[in-house]
A protein has these predicted regions:
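Short amphipathic alpha-helical segments with coiled-coil-like heptad repeat character
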Residues: 11-15, 87, 172
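Non-catalytic alpha-helical coupling and interface elements of nucleotide-dependent molecular machines
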Residues: 16, 46, 76, 80, ...
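Glycine-centered loop/turn positions within well-structured domains
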Residues: 39, 51, 77, 216, ...
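Short flanking/linker segments adjacent to small metal-binding domains or redox-active Cys/His motifs
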Residues: 69-90, 119-135
Length: 256
């Protein structure tokens, strides 16, 4: 962790932290869209206060275990240290903070102390659905997440290659959320297996977090040629094949 502390020290050389604002400059996003308090938790990393760094990171980010692996690191592109050298490795520091939290018990489940008595249904278990469920559960509401597929996670589970985001990382967070009180229901296609009217009757609120699963097609010569697939369809089929292979080490290649 010494390298992360060194990078945290470099962050303190900055006078104007563009990294945390997520502004649009010349039509391009500059800085963190989540408005992560980057200089604050980098400073805590620098001083060795890892638990406080985790608490500060969680103020703005429900899932640093995901973003620290797949985020394009717009914060680093906006880092002023990068004007005269390499930017601060903020993404690596975020990864170090969250993994250190799991290793040392900071990221242990924290069920809400009080329940409000309100019930909320979330339809869809992708990033937005999980974030909504996490926030509502922390506020004491009883949350049930409905997912039409056989595993929780949406594109986190099926759309991102395992080399970028291992399925075990997604499953680890799901277990934490379950222990905090969130209920997950799989193979539940709302509108087909479950009537919307039933949910509206049983829950105080219903959140639609269905995602955008329909791809955009193109009108181009050769589009219908054999071997051309939509990216998400291909990735989803490949990942499902991997998950259903039952190989414990995840080292699975299907040459078909």
């Amino acid at each position: 962790l010494e390298q992360q502390q060194l990078q945290g020290a470099r962050c303190m050389e900055c006078g104007v932290p563009f990294c945390q604002y997520g502004q649009m400059i010349a039509g391009m996003a500059s800085g963190c869209p989540l408005h992560n308090l980057v200089p604050e938790w980098n400073d805590l990393v620098y001083t060795g206060n890892w638990e406080q760094a985790y608490e500060r990171l969680k103020k703005t980010n429900n899932f640093p275990e995901f973003t620290s692996r797949v985020c394009p690191a717009l914060c680093e592109a906006a880092c002023t240290c990068g004007l005269n050298g390499d930017p601060v490795s903020t993404k690596e520091n975020e990864y170090a903070i969250i993994e250190n939290a799991y290793e040392n018990g900071y990221a242990a489940p924290r069920p809400p102390r009080v329940r409000t008595g309100k019930k909320v249904a979330v339809i869809g278990s992708g990033p937005s659905g999980l974030a909504a469920a996490d926030m509502l559960n922390k506020r004491g509401h009883s949350v049930t997440v409905y997912e039409r597929h056989d595993r929780i996670g949406g594109l986190l589970m099926y759309g991102i290659p395992n080399m970028k985001l291992e399925r075990t990382i997604v499953e680890r967070k799901i277990r934490v959320m379950e222990e905090e009180g969130v209920t997950f229901v799989t193979n539940a296609d709302v509108g087909k297996d479950i009537k919307p009217a039933k949910l509206l009757k049983e829950y105080d609120r219903v959140i639609l977090a269905c995602g955008a699963s329909n791809p955009r097609d193109i009108n181009a010569p050769g589009r219908d040629a054999k071997g051309i697939y939509f990216a998400v369809d291909f990735l989803s089929a490949n990942t499902k094949s991997l998950l259903d292979s039952n190989f414990a080490d995840g080292k699975y290649v299907d040459t078909r």
